[in-house]
Amino acid sequence: MPPLLRVEGLKVYFHMPRGVVRAVDEVNIYLNKGEIIGIAGESGSGKSTLALGIMRLIMPPGLIEGGNVYFEDTEVLHLPEKVFNSEYRWKRIAMVFQGSMNGFTPVYKIRDQIKEVLEVHGYTGDPDQRVNELMKMVNLDPSIADRYPHELSGGQKQRAFIAMALALNPQVLIADEPTTALDVITQTHIINLLKQLRKELGISIIFITHDIALMSMIADRMYIMYAGRIVEHADTADIVRKPKHPYTKLLMEAVPDPSKDYIKGIPGFMPDLARLPPGCRFQGRCPFVMDICKREEPGLKRVENSEVACWLYG
């Protein structure tokens, strides 16, 4: 069975006065039906831009410079905007944006804001009944929809925004940092909710985070992203057990350990995406850097059960 969603060679560049920022540079990912994949990396690695590129929500000075996005067998990146907006965006592919729990309009009740989404997209059923269904779907009492955003806790707002993203029964949900600014207990509740939605609705999920430990709780497969490129891809169990790219190893080592009184960070800084060095983009921070790393950029190659972009593996 072909993937439900497939991204091939996606490029998203930002044309700035200081140069062209290659935020997403020839990225390939795929998502199977009923699967949860994770995209992990530090802030600035291109994760959110990749998601916005899939949704075709890149704003100037950003441009989608190349690549393809396939939903089932249909190439959707180059469809007319009117067609993509009416047939795919929110109806087949929906997104919970980073910081979305603060994205509700403060002067309108939650119910009215979800109903507006339904009405704009031509929903023909009873909108109030649909809102009630959606609230129950995310384990909230329907009466919460009759409150203003400021009357909800952070976890309740995040659940309500997930409900709004599910309003039109999408087959794919992109969740961009859905647990940011939530306490650990609430984070776990959101993770469990997404798992529940996958089980009950059969929805496929792209889960984006900088927290690789959190991702290991939910994702079937992981993509590790650095400076606009995928540097490692494997089943979650394989990455957790035996990470191969030096960056992935350092991300794993940076996960806080309660038994230790310090946190190990990753030394150095991500390169300027408008002035990328020749060769590997991780060379300036890599403890295993070699001469070839400074001359040639590695491509993804198969190493055991993983795909890795690193000269350590030939």
Regions found by a protein language model. Name each.
Residues 126-143, 252:
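Conserved ABC ATPase "signature" region
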Residues 64-76:
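Conserved ABC transporter NBD signature motif
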Residues 178, 182-261:
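P-loop NTP-binding/switch modules centered on Walker-like glycine-rich loops
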Residues 167-171:
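A short, proline-enriched helix->beta-strand linker immediately N-terminal to the Walker B motif
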Residues 233-314:
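Short catalytic/signature loops enriched in Gly
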Residues 148-152, 156:
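Conserved ABC ATPase signature
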Residues 76-94, 120, 238-243, 273-277:
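ABC ATPase NBD coupling module
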